[in-house]
């Protein structure tokens, strides 16, 4: 007879926790007490929950567990940024990045093992795709890193003040698990972050963005990276299915009903000679007309096997000035953690690729070499 798998409490939002505790014959406040121990004090041992009665502790120990991904590698950059490799059930790894600043500490978390969207300038996309992360594996990144930095429930300084869903994967291809995880980030019995301090970034899965609007209100960022469909089709292939005009219309629908968003943050990676000319800056101004937004220009962060190069500071400056002259708030993002491959677009993890993307690429490359040799 196989042993029944225990319920991981990190997989449950407040509603799920209260339903579970009701099935134990317990009142909602008992569920809230346990959530406070987990998320405010970083406790994962039921015996350490001093205001939980012995009978309930025994029930919890018999049927439940609190299990987050484990840290396998912790790398600290010169600027204080820390990149974590976190081991999942089954042995695969995802990466999360903690970015300290004077008044806040932002954690970039992953939503999938790998990514299926194949954006050409992103290291994660080159790893292929394996699976969606569970709720416990998403919120568990926040829990594990906060605990590593110093989550104890006593310090006034929070180890994590902001969370951005900008790590490995496309969050809107995992709405089922991303939404409950973000609910735990926002919940007062969870991490208690404000709506404006939790940001979801998407490459443009339009139907899922409309679905998100009905489920949760958080800050929205979009991976645009091109001023027109012709170029974006190449850089961000999901654009072939959901072109820019449809994507931006969905963004407007989302922020129209949002209290967390007055505008959308547009992310634009600066690729030398690809998308960084002043003509393209003017085209971007036209594309963004009618969409309340601010633009983050992101200097490209190189990774092995990629042929793109970073735009020069002068090209980025000229591009930025065109946007600013048109009245668009524009920020050039300073690379953080690039000396440990923790910057935007550099996260890779350890992915068993179910899409066989790497194998197919190698086969194409090998075939191209064979053709060249034959023609020589």
Swiss-Prot record:
A Pfam family it matches: RlmN_N
Per its UniProt record, the required cofactor names are:
[4Fe-4S] cluster
Residues bound to [4Fe-4S] cluster are 115, 119, 122
Enzyme Commission no: 2.1.1.192
Bilayer-crossing regions: none
Keyword vocabulary terms for this entry: 4Fe-4S, Cytoplasm, Disulfide bond, Iron, Iron-sulfur, Metal-binding, Methyltransferase, rRNA processing, S-adenosyl-L-methionine, Transferase, tRNA processing
Show the catalytic activity: adenosine(2503) in 23S rRNA + 2 reduced [2Fe-2S]-[ferredoxin] + 2 S-adenosyl-L-methionine = 2-methyladenosine(2503) in 23S rRNA + 5'-deoxyadenosine + L-methionine + 2 oxidized [2Fe-2S]-[ferredoxin] + S-adenosyl-L-homocysteine; adenosine(37) in tRNA + 2 reduced [2Fe-2S]-[ferredoxin] + 2 S-adenosyl-L-methionine = 2-methyladenosine(37) in tRNA + 5'-deoxyadenosine + L-methionine + 2 oxidized [2Fe-2S]-[ferredoxin] + S-adenosyl-L-homocysteine
Q: List the disulfide bonds.
A: 108-344
User: Care to name a GO molecular-function term for this sequence?
Assistant: rRNA binding
Q: Which GO terms describe its biological process?
A: rRNA base methylation; tRNA methylation
Q: Which residues participate directly in catalysis?
A: 95 (proton acceptor), 344 (s-methylcysteine intermediate)
One GO cellular component term noted in the UniProt record for this chain: cytoplasm
Q: What is its main location?
A: cytoplasm
As for subcellular location, the record says: Cytoplasm
Residues holding S-adenosyl-L-methionine = 169-170, 201, 223-225, 301
Tell me where in this chain the Radical SAM core domain is found. 101-339
Q: Which InterPro entries match?
A: Aldolase_TIM, Methyltransferase_A, RlmN_N, RNA_MTrfase_RlmN, rRNA_lsu_MTrfase_RlmN/Cfr, rSAM
How many and how are cofactors bound here?
Answer: Binds 1 [4Fe-4S] cluster. The cluster is coordinated with 3 cysteines and an exchangeable S-adenosyl-L-methionine.
Q: Which HAMAP family match?
A: RNA_methyltr_RlmN
According to its UniProt entry, the function of this protein is described as: Specifically methylates position 2 of adenine 2503 in 23S rRNA and position 2 of adenine 37 in tRNAs. m2A2503 modification seems to play a crucial role in the proofreading step occurring at the peptidyl transferase center and thus would serve to optimize ribosomal fidelity.
Extra remark: Reaction proceeds by a ping-pong mechanism involving intermediate methylation of a conserved cysteine residue.
Which family does the record assign?
A: Belongs to the radical SAM superfamily. RlmN family.
Return the protein name: Dual-specificity RNA methyltransferase RlmN
Name of the gene this protein is made from? rlmN
């Amino acid at each position: 007879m196989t042993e029944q798998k225990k319920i991981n409490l990190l997989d449950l939002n407040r509603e799920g926790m209260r339903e579970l505790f009701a099935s134990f014959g317990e009142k909602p406040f008992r569920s809230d007490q346990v959530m406070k121990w987990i998320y405010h004090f970083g406790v994962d041992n039921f015996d350490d929950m001093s205001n939980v009665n012995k009978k309930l502790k025994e029930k919890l120990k018999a049927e439940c567990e609190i299990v987050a991904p484990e840290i396998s590698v912790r790398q600290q950059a010169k600027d204080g940024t820390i990149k974590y490799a976190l081991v999942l059930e089954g042995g695969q790894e995802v990466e999360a990045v903690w970015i300290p600043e004077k008044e806040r500490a932002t954690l970039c978390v992953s939503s999938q093992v790998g990514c299926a969207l194949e954006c050409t300038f992103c290291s994660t996309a080159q790893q292929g795709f394996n699976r969606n992360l569970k709720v416990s594996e998403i919120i568990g990144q926040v829990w594990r890193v906060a605990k590593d930095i110093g989550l104890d429930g006593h310090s006034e300084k929070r180890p994590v003040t902001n969370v951005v869903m900008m790590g490995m994967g496309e969050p809107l291809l995992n709405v089922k698990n991303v939404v409950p995880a973000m609910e735990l980030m926002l919940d007062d019995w969870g991490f208690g972050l404000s709506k404006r301090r939790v940001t979801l970034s998407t490459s443009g899965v339009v139907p899922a963005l409309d679905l998100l609007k009905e489920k949760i209100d958080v800050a929205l960022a979009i991976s645009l990276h091109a001023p027109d469909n012709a170029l974006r089709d190449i850089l961000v292939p999901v654009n072939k299915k959901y072109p820019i005009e449809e994507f931006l219309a969905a963004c407007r629908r989302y922020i129209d009903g949002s209290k967390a968003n007055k505008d959308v943050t547009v992310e634009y990676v600066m690729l030398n000679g690809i998308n960084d000319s002043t003509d393209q800056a003017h085209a971007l101004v036209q594309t963004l007309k009618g969409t309340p937004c601010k633009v983050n220009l992101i200097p490209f962060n190189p990774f092995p096997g990629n042929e793109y190069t970073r735009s020069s500071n002068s090209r980025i400056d000229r591009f930025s000035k065109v946007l600013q002259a048109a009245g668009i708030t524009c920020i050039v993002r300073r690379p953080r953690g690039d000396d440990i491959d923790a910057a935007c677009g550099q996260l890779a993890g350890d992915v068993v690729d179910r899409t066989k993307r790497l194998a197919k690429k190698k086969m194409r490359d090998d075939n191209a070499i064979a053709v060249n040799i034959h023609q020589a």
